Amino acid sequence: MVAHAEIKNLSFVYADENEKALQHISLSVQKGEFIALAGGSGSGKTTLLKHFKKELLPIGKRTGDTYYDGTLLENVPDLLSAQEIGMVFQNPENQLVMDTVIQELAFSLENIGLPSHIIQKRIAELISFLGFQDLLHQSVHTLSGGQKQLVNLAAVLVMQPKLLLLDEPTAQLDPIAAKEFLGLLKRINEELGITIVLSEHRLDEVIPLATRVICMNNGRIVYDGSPKTVVANMWEVEKFRPFIPQIPRLFLEWNAKDIPFTVREAQMKLNDFLAISYVSEPIVQSEKQEVILSAEHISFQYEKNNPLILRDLTVSIEKGKWVALVGKNGTGKSTLLTILAGLQKARRGKVKWNGKVIHKIDSKERFKSIGYVSQHPYYHFTFDTVWDEVYERARELYGEQGKEIAEHQLKKFWLYGLKERHPHDCSGGEQQLLALCTTLLSKPTLLLLDEPTKGLDPWKKERVGELFRKLQKEGTTIVMATHDIEFAAKYVDQCMMLFDGAVIMNDAPKEFFSGNFFYTTSINRFIRKELPYALTWEDVYEACQNDMLHS
């Protein structure tokens, strides 16, 4: 049987680079498969995905061949490629080109010359399948991140593709929107028979849906097989263990024979007579510190007649604390961070830092002492190479020592090998690290971070978490907006949930997540009855070794 898509002995090196991005890749994709691509940031996942669609082939030197339905990729007709091979990218903003949702859906169909009655029929049928009729005539600029990504997916599906490629499509979505999006992909795969190849760091949600997992490292495929086989292989190698989702990781630590991937499967394996002593874990209250940053009665809207994004919001941040702002896309987390940083002025209310109104602080002092990283790190970049980006800032701050400091900083953030690369050619995770790297050069005492772990693989995420903890011990206060609730549960001191422009929940992670039904970690959903305050596999493992399993 001819493979749906096939890659034979593919190697690739980007223009102006020496290191190979892909090395001797061979794989075949069968019709109807749901393949999850796993691996570290910069391991070659995005580069590999782009080699399935000829319009996206990166510029550089390649050897080897790619086939689509038995035809060499470069010989596949343009119209066929446009219709049958679709791709959804990480950033929802980057693919939207029209003003309204219906225009966005019609755009690609008009480009391939379909008559208007066929376009109308296709859109009507697709909208009925996806169920978002209420968004059809809305401006794309008013949509939340989750809705924008849904529109991107719909704009690809309306072409009726046979192969769907997705590059970390949930990276900027809140946990509930991400779950819905991935569930929709599974439905598309099962009900429409569309083949899916998906690169994703959120393996907790993806692995239970996938029929096959491919793990990459340094441009090579290291594991390829069923989810259970690949996870078992990853467990054997220490450096791949952080990539294993929380529930299977816990059961592997317990040396269980049959590894569950979902909450339901895991609960079926629990012992019914779990010792009651595990249930009520006391919460240790941390000492109160002085308030270093406060927002008092903040209200904000972008345009005068637009609805308020923040309404009469008041928050206090204590010195040396690490605070996570969580909540759905569009609840005002990013807006609040820019107001706290003094980059935008509230319509009403005021922000104080160290007792001073933020806008009355000298802008030079503010820029040096307050480090802000946007959720779109490429907004920070002004130079043509990674090296210049870091070196020029280091030289500005430290003069002759700048070169040595820049080298040290790049090595610390795993970016030294990319120093000659253009920042915009870096992966999403690498861009995130570069923005963080340059921001930390001035040793700010307040860090305001918008999605700092976005695009980072689990291993780098752990290292960044440890770095932030070290900065905390040195007196740095950290406020981050995040959709990564597993990361927040493991590292932060305090969680605040924004909803309808206000803070509706504010607590330490254990109390915060244990009180939630949907907005919590997979481990907490699995074992909340027995261990209400357990949020990570480490929490459960420390509480009890393996006596929770059925014998």
From Swiss-Prot:
Its EC number is 7.-.-.-. The keyword Repeat applies. ATP 2 binds at G327, K328, N329, G330, T331, G332, K333, S334. One of its GO terms (cellular component) is ATP-binding cassette (ABC) transporter complex. ATP 1 binds at G39, G40, S41, G42, S43, G44, K45, T46. InterPro entries: AAA+_ATPase, ABC_transporter-like_ATP-bd, ABC_transporter-like_CS, ABC_transpr_CbiO/EcfA_su, ECF_ABC_transporter_ATP-bd, P-loop_NTPase. It comes from the Bacteria. Residues 5-243, 293-525 form the ABC transporter domain. Gene3D superfamilies: P-loop containing nucleotide triphosphate hydrolases. Keywords: ATP-binding, Cell membrane, Membrane, Nucleotide-binding, Repeat, Translocase, Transport. It is found in: Cell membrane. SMART domains: AAA (SM00382). GO terms for molecular function: ATP binding; ATP hydrolysis activity; ATPase-coupled transmembrane transporter activity. It holds the Pfam family ABC_tran. It is a peripheral membrane protein. Belongs to the ABC transporter superfamily. Probably part of an ABC transporter complex. Responsible for energy coupling to the transport system. This is Putative ABC transporter ATP-binding protein BA_3364/GBAA_3364/BAS3118.
